[in-house]
């Protein structure tokens, strides 16, 4: 099961901790980042070493604070938030320069994306971040993501990049999250103090016993311990992404995982990603509004599984924002489907009975040809 899951994964989020990209906290490890870049490029290109399947890959990388400390000449990790933010600002320059350089050597384009909790809490910003990342992936670009440490405070921080990796996996509906660390994976107890500790090769990501098995804090270089990785896997499983926790120094670990080799601990999501999203839509009680559609649109939705296009819309009721859950109703007012609105209510009113090719002319921009995409829609009674 574990080998098939990673072998078949098309969209993958990879998270590497500080200890895997720095020289024991003393600045960036150029050779390590070069090696990560080589493996990332192999996955994106679809090298024969892992079956020739092209992947979409996002890298969530720590290391900015450690690099900033080196550039500033600081021997110990600062405790004051403003000093940490200063170190992150200085170090992020070096971190992204290193990835850009090493990925370019592999013939890969890269992009820097800095996120905050506010970006994912606000629905409009969430959708913008999602669409940007999906566009980058379609272009064959490797996004390198980190938290925007310079502008956040403790109340709105993700807390660690394990959590950020899980949230990014949810954001782009990844098939898998790979968390690379300085440990082999998960044990039933701390193997450093318990010789009877048993290695866990596969488990249900939602198993509450996993949190009891996980140990305490991580190293002084980074912030995450095993418990943050378990909680990240649980969060990622909510959108259908399974998680692998593995030793990042394992030779060709990403390429071998993609080839189907069982490495580390696999925490399996019990729900398929499409099922998870559609169940959330179906269970949504607070509908923000609705659109009425003609008989032709009803047939397209029910019988052919098509997306809802503006040309089939007759009327718009209520006030809703882009990304809100709305109902799709027939001429009698009966709910045919519900889904995520791709346009706000004011925009939707302008689009009624219009061809999708007119969207940009009417609105000044286009967020896609659909009012509700079929992947974001649940048909009533199905």
From Swiss-Prot:
Function, in words: Catalyzes the transfer of a phosphate group to glutamate to form L-glutamate 5-phosphate.
TM region positions: none
Native species: Delftia acidovorans (strain DSM 14801 / SPH-1)
Entry keywords, A to Z: Amino-acid biosynthesis, ATP-binding, Cytoplasm, Kinase, Nucleotide-binding, Proline biosynthesis, Transferase
Protein name: Glutamate 5-kinase
EC number(s) per entry: 2.7.2.11
Domain PUA, chain residue ranges per copy: 288-366
GO term, biological process aspect, one: L-proline biosynthetic process
Residues annotated for ATP binding in this entry: 15, 181-182
Gene: proB
GO MF assignments: ATP binding; glutamate 5-kinase activity; RNA binding
Subcellular localization, as worded in the UniProt entry: Cytoplasm
PANTHER family on file: GLUTAMATE 5-KINASE, ISOPENTENYL PHOSPHATE KINASE
Source taxonomy: Bacteria, Pseudomonadati, Pseudomonadota, Betaproteobacteria, Burkholderiales
Annotated SMART domains: PUA
Matches recorded under InterPro entries: AceGlu_kinase-like_sf, Asp/Glu/Uridylate_kinase, G5K_ProB, Glu/AcGlu_kinase, Glu_5kinase, Glu_5kinase/COase_Synthase, Glutamate_5-kinase_CS, PUA
One Gene Ontology cellular component annotation held by this UniProt entry: cytosol
Reaction equations catalysed: L-glutamate + ATP = L-glutamyl 5-phosphate + ADP
Pathway: Amino-acid biosynthesis; L-proline biosynthesis; L-glutamate 5-semialdehyde from L-glutamate: step 1/2
Cited Pfam families: AA_kinase, PUA
Family, similarity comment: Belongs to the glutamate 5-kinase family.
Keyword Cytoplasm in annotation: yes
Annotated binding of substrate, by residue: 62, 149, 161
């Amino acid at each position: 099961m574990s080998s098939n899951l990673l072998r078949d994964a098309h969209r993958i989020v990879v998270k590497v901790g500080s200890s895997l990209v720095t020289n024991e906290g003393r600045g960036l490890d150029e050779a390590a980042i070069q090696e990560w870049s080589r493996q990332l490029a192999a996955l994106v290109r679809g090298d024969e070493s892992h079956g020739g399947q092209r992947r979409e890959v996002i890298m969530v990388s720590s290391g900015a604070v450690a690099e900033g400390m080196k550039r500033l000449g600081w021997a110990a990790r600062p405790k004051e938030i403003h000093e940490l933010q200063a170190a992150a600002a200085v170090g992020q320059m070096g971190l992204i320069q290193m990835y850009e350089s090493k990925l370019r050597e592999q013939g890969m384009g890269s992009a820097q994306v800095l996120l905050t909790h506010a970006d994912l809490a606000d629905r409009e910003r969430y959708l913008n971040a999602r669409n940007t990342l999906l566009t980058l992936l379609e272009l064959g670009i490797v996004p390198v993501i980190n938290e925007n440490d310079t502008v956040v405070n403790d109340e709105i921080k993700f807390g660690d990049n394990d959590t950020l990796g899980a949230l990014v996996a949810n954001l782009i509906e990844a098939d898998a999250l790979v968390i690379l660390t300085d440990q082999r994976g998960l044990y039933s107890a701390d193997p450093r103090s318990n010789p009877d500790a048993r290695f866990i090769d596969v488990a249900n990501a939602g198993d509450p016993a996993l949190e009891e098995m996980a140990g305490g804090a991580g190293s002084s270089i980074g912030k995450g311990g095993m418990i943050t990785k378990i909680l990240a896997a649980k969060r990622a499983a909510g959108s259908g992404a399974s998680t692998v926790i593995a030793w990042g120094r394992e030779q060709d670990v990403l390429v071998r995982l993609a080839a189907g080799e069982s490495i580390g601990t696999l925490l399996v999501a019990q729900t398929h990603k499409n099922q998870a999203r559609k169940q959330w839509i179906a269970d949504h009680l607070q509908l923000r509004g609705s659109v009425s559609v003609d008989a032709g649109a009803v047939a397209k939705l029910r019988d052919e599984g098509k997306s809802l296009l503006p040309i089939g819309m007759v009327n718009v009721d209520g006030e809703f924002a882009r990304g809100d859950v709305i109902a799709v109703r027939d001429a009698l007012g009966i709910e045919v489907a519900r889904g995520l609105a791709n346009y706000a209510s004011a925009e939707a009113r302008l689009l009624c009975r219009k061809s999708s090719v007119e969207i940009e002319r009417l609105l000044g921009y286009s967020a896609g040809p659909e009012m509700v995409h079929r992947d974001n829609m649940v048909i009533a009674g199905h």
